[in-house]
């Protein structure tokens, strides 16, 4: 859910923000502060933070990450298979963000909370 939240925030998909905020809280049991952090590409958990930061960089840079970013996510314990899974998760969320934005999907989840200023 953290990656989905970061990508939805980056892409401005209101439907996906609402859906993943709800799922993050009620299924993944993330605290509101953790949901807010994920929307900014961060986490209070060091390993999740590395994955979420890397995922947001993949989205922002359209896959053009540098060696330092790869080294950082590897240093957090992610191997090539897990890095590929992060990239695929980003790609899937970009797809659903675009589809729901173009389709102007009606938000049928509670609205995402406003993020607190950092």
Identify the meaning behind each predicted range.
Residues 1-118:
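Hydrophobic alpha-helical segments
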């Amino acid at each position: 859910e953290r990656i989905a939240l970061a990508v939805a925030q980056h892409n401005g998909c209101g439907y996906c923000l609402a859906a993943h905020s709800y799922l993050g809280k009620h299924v993944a049991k993330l605290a509101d502060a953790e949901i807010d952090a994920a929307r900014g590409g961060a986490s209070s958990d060091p390993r999740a933070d590395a994955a979420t930061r890397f995922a947001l960089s993949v989205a922002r840079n359209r896959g053009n990450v540098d060696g330092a970013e790869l080294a950082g996510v590897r240093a957090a314990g992610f191997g090539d298979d897990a890095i590929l899974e992060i990239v695929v998760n980003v790609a899937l969320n970009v797809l659903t963000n675009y589809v729901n934005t173009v389709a102007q999907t009606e938000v049928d989840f509670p609205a995402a909370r406003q993020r607190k200023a950092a």
